[in-house]
Amino acid sequence: MKSINQIRKISIWIFIIPVVALNLCLLISVNHELFEGTIFQVGAIGKIGFTIPYVDGIVSISRTARTYPAYLIFKPAMIFTAILLIKYWIANNKLIVTVNGEDDKRKYFLIFGVGSALFLIAHSIFLGIKFDHDLYKFFRRFVILGFIIFEIVAQTLLVINIFKVKEKMERLINKKILILKIILVIILIITALVAIPFLSSSGYPRFKHALEWNYFIGVVFFYLLSFLFWKKVLS
């Protein structure tokens, strides 16, 4: 099936692009002195010392990504990733419908998947825009929370749909990777639920930052597993 090869190609780029962009922004912030006196001089907020935020949580993703010149990398990368996400969910919807031969052309994972991509686009556009108003601050939190919730729901529903039809596609899939995808989704859900009390409090900044970095990697790691899950179909 051509759609499987398409899904594989899209999946690997959905993993690579945000991971590379995110860590490039981190490297720019950590090595800000390299850009002193150039047109790419890092803004004051973006200047930080050596840190491994995945472990120490010293800095947030937003701080490394929202200042010049990091946002020149981060914003286009996230918007392009969102476009790929839309294509990914549409391709998966077509594949599941084809395998099942169903009349219902729209799966719920498609709605949540496309929704998560739209939230990501909105988050990328408004990142770094300063507007001191409570409603705007609420909107930003709502957008990032919407992306996370919609993305996790979409991933969960897709895994459920694939699990239901796995016997029909056993020659095209890697069942061990399917198990890993199920485990990953469960971990993401449990982590989100356990983290709610911490995220709703005003304390634990380093914990929140470290969780943010690692959770982001966990979310996009799903797409690396998607690439490995489908076996390449020879045309």
Show which residues each predicted segment covers.
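Alpha-helical transmembrane segments and their helix-start/interface "positive-inside/aromatic belt" motifs
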Residues: 2-22, 107, 173-182
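Juxtamembrane "helix-exit" motif on the non-cytosolic side of transmembrane helices
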Residues: 97, 125-133, 193-204
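Terminal transmembrane helical module of multi-pass membrane proteins
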Residues: 157-235
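Membrane-proximal helix-loop-helix units in multi-pass membrane proteins
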Residues: 116-172
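Alpha-helical transmembrane segments of multi-pass membrane proteins
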Residues: 18-38
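Cytoplasmic juxtamembrane regions at transmembrane-helix boundaries
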Residues: 84-115
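Interfacial helix-start motif at the membrane-water boundary
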Residues: 55-80
